[in-house]
Amino acid sequence: MFSTNKNRKIGMLIFLFVVSFIVGMLINIQRLGSLPMKLIQVEWNDTVGCVYENLDYENPSDHKYDLYVPKNLDTPESKCLILYIHGGSFNSGSKEDDDAWCKYYTSKGYVTATVDYTLQSKKGKSEEELLNASLELMNEEILSCVAAIKEQASQLGIDLTQMATCGVSAGGTLAMNYAYKNADISAIPVKFVFQLAGPASFEPSDWSLLKSIDHITTDADFATMMTGVRITDEMMASKEYLPYIYSVSPTYLVDANSVPTLMGYGLIDHCVPTQLKYPLIDALKENGVPYDYVEFPKSNHGMYNDIDKLQEFINLSLEYCDKYFDK
């Protein structure tokens, strides 16, 4: 009886500790979570700009984009587009997630936009689902969206002559992929890219967490889903899959012609493997590509715990606008 009561007390203490830890963590996230947004909050009204919502672009799933236009169109900045690409592990999120960021940069005089794109299913996947939500498809959709933005802006009397891509997490990857693959063929030429916490490569063995979230059981299926190419176990064993993985991995898209890159990563990120940023940095360095890396020493994937570093990143993004946009 004594032993049973003792075990119950120990169990209750453990339970209370866990509950206290979780509550404390949630309070801390709530306390800190609003701080990053305060850095980019603007008082938005028609003296700052206007938003054109749910505009069409050519894609197979009727995705839309939103366009943010500054009030003053008689400035060099108003000829520059900043395209924000939402994150969400490639399987969630929406263009509305980026509203505050778009309004912030529009308040600085830039045209901004945010886009919805095809997402990967979180459920059990058929072969068709594996093949039809790849990073290649997402890139093609964004390419189509930029063409639509160029046309829509022209109808509004705006001649967009250059752009930057940006994003957080999965959006950061797509921003880099777009900038490195499409800088010259984009309807609006890309001058630079800036991103936070974007995965830089997709070697399947590095991605046990994402495979678990997406209910992917084999490396071959993971590679298939990311690339849109039917990857077999035999291709995995022979390394024949590697060129396809490289084609959707920012690190391996970098060359001497790549655009300047601003990036930030948390050192205790439990979602994106922290080691993946180093080959990206090496690739930029080896190819002589201008870059800045802002390190968030106390931050996980949400980048909540280094407000000073986030402010540094935002300031640098505006410096990139001044330096790399031709005004």
Tell where the protein language model's regions lie, with residue ranges:
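Alpha/beta-hydrolase fold nucleophile elbow
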Residues: G157-S169
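Short amphipathic alpha-helix adjacent to the substrate-entry channel of hydrolases
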Residues: E96-T114
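Alpha/beta-hydrolase active-site loop
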Residues: N132-S154
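N-terminal cap/lid segment of alpha/beta-hydrolase-fold proteins
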Residues: L32-P76
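C-terminal catalytic histidine-bearing segment of alpha/beta-hydrolase fold enzymes
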Residues: K125-E127, L262-G264, Q275-K327
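Hydrolase active-site cap/lid region
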Residues: G33-S34, L39-E43, Y180-A237
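Short beta-strand element of the alpha/beta-hydrolase
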Residues: E77-G87
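Short beta-strand/loop motif that positions the catalytic acidic residue
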Residues: N257, M263-Y265, D269
